[in-house]
UniProtKB/Swiss-Prot annotation:
A GO biological process held by the record: prolyl-tRNA aminoacylation
Superkingdom field: Bacteria
InterPro entries assigned: aa-tRNA-synt_IIb, aa-tRNA-synth_II, aa-tRNA-synth_II/BPL/LPL, Anticodon-bd, Anticodon-bd_dom_sf, Pro-tRNA-ligase_IIa, Pro-tRNA-synth_IIa_bac-type, Pro-tRNA-Synthase_IIa_type1
Source organism: Bifidobacterium longum (strain NCC 2705)
Record's comment describing the protein's domains: Consists of three domains: the N-terminal catalytic domain, the editing domain and the C-terminal anticodon-binding domain.
Listed SUPFAM superfamilies: Class II aaRS ABD-related, Class II aaRS and biotin synthetases, YbaK/ProRS associated domain
Protein name from the UniProt record: Proline--tRNA ligase
Length: 597
């Protein structure tokens, strides 16, 4: 360590917000270059390279072939798939000296597709799966959590190309199986969850989440063991309500009833229910005005805005992230005053269905607003809701009888105890970090970029694609996040920067000679070693650094070696401490390390 490019820190960096970011910097694995941008130091690269080696072994094992694309990419392919616009501010864009547009790659779907298009033309060339491990770039608005949410990161991305949908599915499950083996070998707990495809497009997707409290993603678990990303949850179909005995809708004055609580109080005082119970928040149809910011598309030459209204039960709140996933690649925001001015029929506090969507024409509305409802609003249900006049509401307005909608969406937050989509029981929730995702892309990119091959009949057909990503640098951070204690990191043996941390203590040259001999014996057995040969550093500091760096095994060569020729062996956490004769130390350490692997 006296010559190793390494400096450990005693204090946590002031801006480190999660344990992995604190420990990786303190232990000398990474250094911050700028927000969301990190320099890899020798120890960090050792671990990163070992993770990459495991990924390569498993991905090569399913027949994939490695390539390497540039990170600086031209604009044109991304325009063809509309992702130049869809990514918005999330990508780094630049111009060369000739004013040509480029971007720093956030992903490489377009480039992989064009490469196969350039080289392959027949069904006989397929199937093929290509992958790379490469640096990606995304202009995160607020980088956080160290390597977990950065602007520059290392990612493994693979793409399968097959002649038909069946081939795509086979490639998908081959890759999925390889992912499970990778995470198991890395000793990283994971949960596969059903997910939305988002801007990537495609028909099916699963995320691999590492459960941990700092995770940005919430996922739902069913008693059956199945799991869903919250955005991908679907509400089990609810039975239609028989509205034959529901009183006719009535429109009544409701002064001072702009809030849910005011509406409930007013309803119970002025309009008692006929079914023996009081009005409650779940009886109120809350209509939320939202602006959809669409990117450019085939019908619009520039981004455009659309105002919509979403109806949800009054006891639920709109989950914008969940709702936005269904509008991808568009973005959602609460409607502005300027948006509302375009629709004078929307009376704040009293917005109701009777001027929206299918009802707009009968109400004389010339610029109708699309009306969507959450899946918890079932046909036949009667509602207390706005009447589109100031201080006036409807009672007993029945969905299906009195008003219709333009569509049904998953709009509200999901609660603990809600029924799971598979009907196996109530949902519970955990948080996790996405470490991988697999997509069945289908024909999205092959059609957009005209990737076709001749089939067995000589007909040009589009190629079926799959996409598979692992956040390599994020995986490293997640392992650090889940493999540490108060003293420091505790790496799984398979990716630790070394097998043994040899510590020479004291001032006697004999101890250092014994340590050097042990290092040579360990290296002769093929074991990597970190050797702390610093002579002006106290034993206490050396032991603290050994715990901080997190190598699985520690060997102490000091006073006991000088006095009786023994070397102390122990695990990183200080357990299984034993003194062995120096001649047996290398073999004992090799056996211990083999047992860990």
């Amino acid at each position: 360590m006296s010559t190793m490019f390494l400096r450990t820190l005693r204090e946590d960096p002031a801006d480190a917000d999660v344990d992995s970011a604190k420990l990786l910097q303190r232990a000398g694995y990474i250094r911050k270059a700028a927000p969301g941008i990190w320099t890899w130091l020798p120890l960090g690269l050792r671990v990163l390279n070992k993770i990459e080696a495991i990924i390569r072994e498993e991905i090569n094992g399913i027949g994939a072939q490695e390539v390497h694309f540039p990170a600086l990419l031209p604009r044109e392919p991304y325009e063809a798939t509309h992702r130049w616009e869809e990514y918005g501010d999330n990508i780094f864009r630049l111009k060369d000296r000739h004013e040509a547009d480029y971007l720093l790659a956030p992903t490489h779907e377009e480039m992989f597709t064009l490469l196969v298009k350039d080289m392959y033309s027949s069904y006989k060339d397929l199937p093929v799966t290509l992958y790379q491990i490469q640096t990606k770039y995304r202009d995160e608005f607020r980088p956080r959590a160290g390597l977990i949410r950065g602007r520059e990161f290392v990612m493994k991305d693979a793409y399968s190309f097959t002649i038909d949908e069946e081939g795509m599915r086979k490639a998908y499950y081959d890759e999925r199986g390889a992912y499970e083996r990778i995470f198991q070998r890395l000793d990283l707990k994971y949960v596969p969850v059903f997910a939305m495809s988002g801007p990537m497009g495609g028909s099916a997707s699963e995320e691999f989440l590492a459960p941990m409290p700092i995770g940005e993603d919430t996922f739902a678990l069913a008693p059956s063991g199945k799991a869903w990303n919250v955005e991908a949850l679907s509400t089990p179909e609810l039975p239609e309500i028989d509205a034959s005995t529901t009183p006719a809708a009535s429109k009544e004055a409701t002064p001072d009833a702009k809030t849910i609580d005011n509406m409930i109080e007013r309803a119970n005082a002025d309009h008692p229910r006929t079914d023996g119970r009081e009005w409650q928040a779940s009886d109120i149809l809350k209509n939320v005005v939202i602006t959809v910011k669409h990117p450019e598309d085939e019908e619009h030459d520039e981004p455009w805005r659309e105002v919509i209204v979403v109806g949800v039960p009054g006891d639920r709140t709109v989950d914008m992230k969940r709702l936005e996933a269904q509008f991808a690649p568009a973005e959602l925001e609460e409607a502005t005053e300027e948006d509302l001015k375009q629709h004078p029929e929307l009376v704040p506090g009293y917005i109701g269905p009777m001027v929206l969507g299918p009802q707009a024409e009968a109400a004389g509305v010339k610029n109708p607003v699309r009306y969507l409802i959450d899946a918890h609003v079932v046909k036949g249900s009667a509602w207390f809701t706005g009447a589109d006049e100031n201080e006036v509401d409807y009672y007993n307005l029945v969905y299906g009888r009195d008003f219709k909608v333009d569509g049904v969406v998953e709009a509200v937050e999901v609660r603990h105890g809600d029924m799971s989509p598979d009907g196996s029981g109530p949902l519970s929730f955990e948080r996790g970090v996405e470490i991988g995702q697999v997509f069945q892309l289908g024909l999205k990119y092959s059609k957009a970029l005209d990737l076709k091959v001749l089939d067995q009949n000589g007909k040009a057909v589009p190629v079926w694609m799959g996409c598979y990503g692992i956040g390599v640098s994020r995986v490293l951070a997640c392992i650090a996040e889940t493999h540490h204690d108060e003293a420091g990191l505790a790496w799984p043996s398979v990716i630790a920067p070394a097998a043994v941390h040899v510590v020479a203590t004291g001032k006697d040259a004999v101890a250092f000679e014994g340590a050097e001999k042990l290092v040579a014996e360990l290296e002769a057995k093929g074991l990597e070693v970190i050797y702390d040969d610093r002579k002006k550093v106290s034993p206490g500091v050396k032991f603290k650094d050994a715990e901080l760096i997190g190598v699985p095994l520690v060997a102490v060569v000091g006073r006991d070696y000088v006095n009786d020729g023994t070397i102390e062996l122990r695990d990183r956490n200080g357990e299984n401490k034993v003194a062995v004769p120096a001649a047996e130390a290398a073999d004992a350490l090799a056996e211990r390390f083999a047992a860990l692997s």
